[in-house]
Amino acid sequence: MMKKIDVKILDPRVGQQFPLPTYATSGSAGLDLRACLDGAVELAPGATTLVPTGLAIHIADPSLAAVMLPRSGLGHKHGIVLGNLVGLIDSDYQGQLMVSIWNRGQDSFTIEPGERIAQMVFVPVVQAEFNLVEAFDATERGEGGFGHSGRK
């Protein structure tokens, strides 16, 4: 059975004026986050801004986190990506979800109220445990770094 996360809605316009976040298909990993704005915001080339989503989250389960990712169409067609490239939401964060938006394009871009601006994906978390060792067990690859395994 698929695990569910409780997402609180802070802004009463979400679900009324702006649609609730949804998964586009049964196989969608990400759900769309919308700009919960009172009016349009123009973003000049090279500029960044924080945009509220109207949602708050407390994942609570330390085995889960969420990541905010750019929407591929906005990045490819308009140069609109996340200001921090990927937003990480830890399980113990409790608060409103804000999206840092960066216009890396050459033209101004207008963010409209209710526009889909990013997507959020929930992911499992594995925490590393560090152990000081003298050497690793030998592998076929060894210390081969960038490009070591070839292109074909």
From Swiss-Prot:
This enzyme is involved in nucleotide metabolism: it produces dUMP, the immediate precursor of thymidine nucleotides and it decreases the intracellular concentration of dUTP so that uracil cannot be incorporated into DNA. One of its GO terms (molecular function) is dUTP diphosphatase activity. It comes from Salmonella arizonae (strain ATCC BAA-731 / CDC346-86 / RSK2980). Its EC number is 3.6.1.23. Pathway: Pyrimidine metabolism; dUMP biosynthesis; dUMP from dCTP (dUTP route): step 2/2. Its cofactor is Mg(2+). Belongs to the dUTPase family. This is Deoxyuridine 5'-triphosphate nucleotidohydrolase. Substrate binds at R71, S72, G73, N84, L88, I89, D90, M98.
